[in-house]
Amino acid sequence: VFKPSKLLNYGELIEPPISFNTFTIEEISRPTAESALIDTSASIDSVTSLEALKGRWVLAYITQGDKCAEECKDNLYLTRQVRLMTGKNRFRVERMWITFQGNLSIPDSDRGEFDGLWTFKTDVNQTPFNAEPAYFAGVWIVDPLGRLIMKYPFGADPKKVYKDLSRLLKASRIG
């Protein structure tokens, strides 16, 4: 098998991808705007697994804590900006924030910055993260089949994340 000597992607490509569909999640809050899933499927009662988001690309921010300090806000802002940068393709992309601990709390003063954001909590022992939860903290791209395929470092360059995502959107026949 031929492997190119130079990779084009900025994020860490996960091989093999990690399935993200089968574990149980608990919905904390859902977007009121800027979500194609909400706009087209208002009949969804409660999301208890990522099966509901199947067929969508997802920019996911995964964290171990339930508070949103500056680093958290920066990463959530990154997911928002990257989604908006996709232009007409933004309705193919959802945003989510998942925590392993407690309920996520978004201060009322920050609500506008979090439009279009799904928030969930999950038990680390039921997820693919049970090996090393700290590794999974960060920004990820989840493909339309519900697999973690690319991870980004904290403080990632939004333009480079966008470039990776736009390549995936262009090449994808699903989602």
Where are these regions (language model features)?
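Extracytoplasmic
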Residues: 54-56, 90-92, 134
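Thiol-/selenol-based redox modules, centered on thioredoxin-like
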Residues: 135, 141-175
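Structural microenvironment flanking redox-active thiols in thiol-disulfide oxidoreductases
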Residues: 68-112
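N-terminal "domain-start" segment that seeds a small globular fold
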Residues: 1-51, 74
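Short, surface-exposed patches at the edges or C-terminal ends of soluble domains, predominantly
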Residues: 2, 80-85, 126, 163-175
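Residue-level signal for short, function-critical loop segments
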Residues: 63-65, 101, 145
